[in-house]
Amino acid sequence: MGAANKKQELRLKRKARIRKKIAGTPERPRLSIFRSARHIYAQLIDDTKGVTFVTASSNEPDVKNNTELSGKNKSEVAVFVGKLIAGRAKDKGISSVVFDRGGFVYHGRVKAVSDGAREGGLNF
């Protein structure tokens, strides 16, 4: 087994451990984060119904075509994605969430998304 596969396997084990303990509800959905090598994705999920309320990612046109973000590093884009999902959540009437780091270390871009969401007005 390669080192990359081992890292992913360990991340998936961490993710399963976390998901056993937390779940999103309609009043307090789960803010789920996924981080790829190039992009970051965030979504608000109600686990009782299996419904996604709001999504935001660095791969969508609102972020890609934003002239303020050209030349910014991935962490700065992640903060913007956090603010974007917070704004969309406010539009849906959601103010409080449960944070799901998805097995990723709470550091770097994952932390940047949560900081941006907090700045945008979401309570964790």
UniProtKB/Swiss-Prot annotation:
InterPro entries: Ribosomal_uL18_bac-type, Ribosomal_uL18_bac/euk. GO terms for molecular function: 5S rRNA binding; structural constituent of ribosome. It comes from the Bacteria. GO terms for cellular component: cytosolic large ribosomal subunit. It holds the Pfam family Ribosomal_L18p. The keyword Nucleotide-binding does not apply. Keywords: Ribonucleoprotein, Ribosomal protein, RNA-binding, rRNA-binding. The keyword Ribonucleoprotein applies. One of its GO terms (biological process) is translation. Belongs to the universal ribosomal protein uL18 family. Part of the 50S ribosomal subunit; part of the 5S rRNA/L5/L18/L25 subcomplex. Contacts the 5S and 23S rRNAs. This is one of the proteins that bind and probably mediate the attachment of the 5S RNA into the large ribosomal subunit, where it forms part of the central protuberance. This is Large ribosomal subunit protein uL18. It comes from Desulfosudis oleivorans (strain DSM 6200 / JCM 39069 / Hxd3). The gene is rplR.
